[in-house]
UniProtKB/Swiss-Prot annotation:
Listed GO biological process terms: proteolysis
Function of the molecule: Thrombin-like snake venom serine protease that has fibrinogen-clotting activity (217 NIH units/mg). It releases fibrinopeptide A and a small amount of fibrinopeptide B from fibrinogen alpha (FGA) and beta (FGB).
Keyword Glycoprotein: yes
Keywords assigned: Blood coagulation cascade activating toxin, Disulfide bond, Glycoprotein, Hemostasis impairing toxin, Hydrolase, Protease, Secreted, Serine protease, Toxin
Regulation of this protein's activity per its record: Amidolytic and clotting activities are completely inhibited by NPGB and PMSF, but not inhibited by EDTA.
E.C. no: 3.4.21.-
Class of enzymatic activity (EC top level): hydrolase
Family listed: Belongs to the peptidase S1 family. Snake venom subfamily.
Record text on subunit structure and interactions: Monomer.
Keyword flag Methyltransferase: no
Protein name: Thrombin-like enzyme jerdonobin
Modification(s) after translation: Glycosylated.
């Protein structure tokens, strides 16, 4: 899937931001 890695990275950063709280 083209662009799938980018989406995963964005989701990963989002989850990390949530856990950072």
């Amino acid at each position: 899937v083209i662009g799938g890695d980018e989406c995963n990275i964005n989701e990963h950063r989002f989850l990390v931001a949530l856990y950072d709280f």
